[in-house]
């Protein structure tokens, strides 16, 4: 049987740190939680640059782990 996939949630945050290989540390606006995130494939393909201090939209995986930056605001 096929189970329903859990919905992914998205939050807005600010980039606080940049690491090699398009990894970033993002602090969410609602909570004071910091998470490790990576760039989505389309953002890598179009070479969209993310700088420290940028507001970004992050998609959070319901199973934990890293978040994915899907939009620069």
Model-based region annotation:
Residues 1-73:
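Exposed beta-strand/loop interface patches that mediate assembly or binding
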């Amino acid at each position: 049987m096929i189970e329903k996939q859990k919905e992914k949630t998205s939050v807005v945050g600010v980039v606080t740190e940049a690491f090699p290989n398009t990894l970033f540390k993002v602090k969410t606006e609602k909570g004071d939680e910091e998470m490790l995130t990576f760039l989505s494939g389309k953002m890598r393909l179009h070479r969209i640059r993310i700088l420290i201090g940028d507001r970004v939209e992050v998609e959070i995986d319901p199973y934990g782990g890293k978040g994915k930056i899907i939009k620069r605001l």
